[in-house]
Amino acid sequence: MTEENPWKTLSTEMKYDNPWIQVNESKVINPAGNDGIYGVVHFKNRAMAIVPLDDDNNTWIVGQFRYTTNTYEWEVIEGGVPEGEDLLIGAKRELEEEAGLIASDWKMIIDGCQLSNSVSDEIGYAFVARGLTVVDANPEETEQLQIRKLPF
């Protein structure tokens, strides 16, 4: 088995673009030698997850309605960090915005993980945050969040 790319790209066309994603469609020859198409979603932000832990090993999750799945979801605290912004600065912002928490001790636990590499190039990062102080949450205007504290 070789690690060389078995796909051949014949052409690529941008099909959709907005401030968060770009969708490209490529005409390809697949590894079986057949003509085909392949769609790729390019994410313009990096995905960031934060697991806050207090001194009693409690954590926080946020609940919100997700348009994509048409369901209410309970999730770790997460958000997007633009290219060029320091990952830790973005993580601190998301923790305060979504959960109303400020942390004094940060440890990166995921340093670049492909999240859905069959259809997108989204890369995810994650931190554990400790030394917590509670402040007022300040979610984005489109986020209607519930916050739950629970044992880790």
Can you say where each PLM-predicted feature lies in the sequence?
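Acidic, metal-coordinating catalytic segment for phosphate/diphosphate chemistry
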Residues: 11-49, 55
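Short beta-strand micro-motifs in enzyme catalytic cores
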Residues: 22-26, 72, 123-125, 146
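Active-site segment of metal-dependent pyrophosphate-handling enzymes
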Residues: 42-45, 53-56, 66, 75, ...
